[in-house]
Amino acid sequence: MPRRRRVNLKAKGINAERELVHLFHKFGWSAVRIAGSGSSKYPCPDVLAGNGFRRIAVEAKLISKPRKYFSQEDVEQLYTFSKTFGCEAWIAIKFPDTSWAFFNPEDLEETASAFVASKDMIEIKALTINELLEVG
């Protein structure tokens, strides 16, 4: 992949994570984006959010294809961090021109070599931000 395209994809991911942080704040939660989360040797999510009662670790993905693949290592690291930190593990996916969709990593479909989130699965099992945060 050419360097310019990699930088653009990285910038889109960073902006998506920042959008998610703003969304949590809009609902009265505190949230932070963890810079370099995908390149750390230690397990860490993209976003941490909490409201004094609940803590959530979020792996955030902005995607345009109908399926998103996650390596077994990615899923294990999210679980490892969440268990050690004492928080819930969630995956957030945003398709173009849609709202964020949140789902538990347990909802991922397992293939021979990876886990996959399909658009169909997301439409059936995902929560909106209101449902995730139990607002309204």
What annotation goes with each model-predicted range?
Residues 35-37, 93-96:
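Acidic carboxylate-rich catalytic motifs and surrounding loops in phosphoryl-/glycosyl-chemistry enzymes
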Residues 42-44, 53-57, 73, 84-86:
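Short connector loops at helix/strand junctions that flank enzyme active sites
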Residues 1-36:
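Acidic-basic catalytic patches of nuclease active cores, encompassing PD-(D/E)XK
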Residues 7-11, 88, 94-136:
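Domain-level recognition of nuclease-like catalytic cores that cleave nucleotide substrates
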Residues 63-94:
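Short, charged, amphipathic alpha-helix that recurs within catalytic cores of restriction-modification
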Residues 27-52:
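Active-site metal-binding core of divalent-cation-utilizing nuclease and nuclease-like domains
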Residues 24, 47-64:
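Conserved catalytic cores of phosphodiester-cleaving nucleases, focusing on short active-site segments
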Residues 20, 43, 74-78:
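Amphipathic alpha-helical interface surfaces
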